[in-house]
From Swiss-Prot:
This is Small ribosomal subunit protein bS21. The gene is rpsU. The lineage of its organism: Bacteria, Pseudomonadati, Campylobacterota, Epsilonproteobacteria, Campylobacterales. Keywords: Ribonucleoprotein, Ribosomal protein. Belongs to the bacterial ribosomal protein bS21 family. HAMAP family: Ribosomal_bS21.
Length: 70
């Protein structure tokens, strides 16, 4: 869990901004949203398969685009 040290001369807004930045860096909000509902392993594998396919197609597109310029 992120925590910050608030200095005596620091305003609430600055401390809040620091805290939000740490939360965003640690991906806490996205993880909580992902874990909000139970997801069976079959669904997780399905999503991983889809994302792997998207990544592969993107790389293939970039490779073909690069080769066409040569």
């Amino acid at each position: 869990m992120p925590g910050i040290k608030v200095h005596p001369n620091e305003s609430f807004d600055e401390a809040y901004r620091k805290f939000k930045k740490q939360v965003d860096r640690n991906l806490i909000v996205t993880e909580v949203r992902a874990r909000r509902f139970f997801e069976p392993m079959t669904e997780i594998r399905k999503k991983q398969k889809i994302s792997a396919r998207k990544k592969m197609l993107k790389r293939l597109y970039m490779l073909r685009r690069y080769e066409s310029r040569l």
